[in-house]
Amino acid sequence: MQTNWMKEEIVRQCKIPAERVQVKFPPVEMLKTDPWQMEEEHAVFFFPAGPPAYKNHRTFLKACELLKKRGCTDWEAVWTLNGDENDGIRALKKEAEEKTLPIRFVGMMSREDLFAQYARSVLVFPSYIETIGLPLLEARSVGAPILAADCLYARDGVGDYEKAEFFETFNAKKLSEMMERFCR
């Protein structure tokens, strides 16, 4: 198993003795980059994720909408999608454009660009199904703040990291309140 929460679920569901299941965290190569520092002009909320529905882009988009409605305008969101991956993502991009939300669809990034983005952003990670949640580990490695869905994988992935905060998975209002604290 890759994580403790996966081990606990296997033990519980398969009724296997816990001592027979080992957690072997996969090796993850972190790139050297400058330590985290917030963008000077505005907050940047970064969501590196593919297009599957379980990544929960909808909750993030709703949080962005609520943030804008409260008058917070000095921010942008950066998504590693190009906006035409599937019907669901196309609909989200169209909605973001119609509501003039500052969500940039930048497409895939090199590892170097990815780590540079972590170093100047707040990671928002609303996904509700992951094994490890690699972006959590990557953002933590540069000292970036993390706003993550309150799921077992996320708690396991960030451990006792003091810059991690959690929101109920589909609670866009709570996420927007957490994001607002980073706005100037």
Language model features: what each stretch is:
Residues 1-12, 16-32:
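Donor nucleotide-sugar binding/catalytic pocket of nucleotide-sugar-dependent glycosyltransferases
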Residues 38-55, 61-64, 78:
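Conserved donor-binding/catalytic core segment of Leloir-type glycosyltransferases
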Residues 75-90, 107-108:
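Glycosyltransferase donor-sugar binding loop
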Residues 89-112:
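Nucleotide-activated donor-binding/catalytic signature segment of Leloir-type glycosyltransferases, i.e.
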Residues 110-121, 141, 155, 159:
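Short acidic alpha-helix that forms the nucleotide-activated donor recognition element
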Residues 124, 145-149:
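Short hydrophobic beta-strand element within catalytic cores of glycosyltransferases
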Residues 128:
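Aromatic "clamp/platform" in nucleotide-sugar-dependent glycosyltransferases that forms part
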Residues 164-173, 181-183:
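Conserved acidic donor-binding segment of nucleotide-sugar-dependent glycosyltransferases
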